[in-house]
Amino acid sequence: MDEKKTFLHYLKYQKNYSVLTLESYDRELTDFLLFIGKESISLQEVDYYVIQNYLIHLNEKHLSHTTINHYLSSLRSFFKYLCKQEIVSSNPFT
């Protein structure tokens, strides 16, 4: 997805994130994008309820609370970036 690629580029070149951190963001965002893709939900349509359903999805994968919190943190950053770039009109985390 172009938005993910642009965001990762921003993290690499503007924020100077490490390769391992970028790989983590890539993995976590890919999981979320696949989740919304299966439900035919666009980034613009993501709201509080989609995030809640994604949280259920993560819990069903038996991930640790720390890992789930990291996924959510990555998504918060991603949506903050998307709002700042005016790619989406609202942030489901605010």
Feature locations, PLM:
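N-terminal core-binding DNA-recognition domain of tyrosine recombinases/integrases
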Residues: 4-20, 26-94
